[in-house]
Amino acid sequence: MNAPDQNQTVRATDLTRQFGERVAVDKVSFELHRGEVLGFLGPNGAGKTTTMQMLTGNLAPSAGQVEICGIDMLDRPTDAKARIGYLPETPPLYRDLTVNEFLQLAGRLHRVPKKELATAVESAKQRCGIGDVGQRLIGALSKGYQQRVGIAQAIIHNPDVVILDEPTVGLDPNQIRDIRALIRELGGAHSVILSTHILPEVEQVCNRVQIIHKGKLVFADSLGGVKAFRGRSLMLGLRNAPPIEAIAAVPGVAQVELARGGMFRVQPAPDTDPTDALVQAAWDGKWNLFQLAPAVSSIEDVFVQLTHREEHA
């Protein structure tokens, strides 16, 4: 029997959740290790929030298993949840408390020993850049500072796993930059799951990416793997380009988008490879083909390909 992986902090196995006849999450499996910052992406209604609720122990799965640092969430929920810090999309803040009062309350709720509470509060404040606002009412703080307080309550007990749900929504550009820097810093000491709709944010702060669509995990790789993802998209370069409708009419082509410099992004139809047909059409039509290659993908490219292909099939 293999020894348990001491660096593994989250393990989800065939995680499934049904609501009546509807399957919201369908056999989702993945692992997370120390030092990893995972970007968790999905369209609205894809099952992302349901998955987050199961990971944090707020919703029981219909089937499957969640383990936090080797602790089964269903068998030992209190012990498993003690290893998690969670910031919901709407931070659970008491606006009439000072920052210090709120973090002391959060520490007690997380069962930080009384003799360690003051140190834990100061450490969380310093890490989150709120050391100078401890005596201020939370309701008097800017949204950016309130988000920092929300993250501070999530890490006050020094959890192994930090889960952040849309932490930069509604912030101004400077606040967004600061929160992203904080998330990168958290990734050095914790495992972080970042749920966001802001795709460039994942490229800036995460080293792993997962995409869920219609309840199924459709992509899981490192950030480097995103760029290597060939998917189905092709880049077509023509010096004597015809109307875009002529390219779209080539057998096996499902969609064409104009890029720049005589470049077109071509989306093949399902289970087809239009490469030969495009070359032949370019020759016959004297389109002066100078490039035809798989597109180098961004997170946005991968996201669009994987979450829209069924709708356009």
Task: Describe the residue ranges of each PLM region.
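ABC transporter nucleotide-binding domain
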Residues: 178-269
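ABC transporter nucleotide-binding domains
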Residues: 7-12, 17-213, 219
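Non-catalytic surface loops within mature trypsin-like serine protease
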Residues: 34, 132, 240, 268-270, ...
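A short linear hydrophobic-aromatic micro-motif
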Residues: 129, 252-257, 288-293
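C-terminal coupling/interaction segments
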Residues: 2-4, 270-313
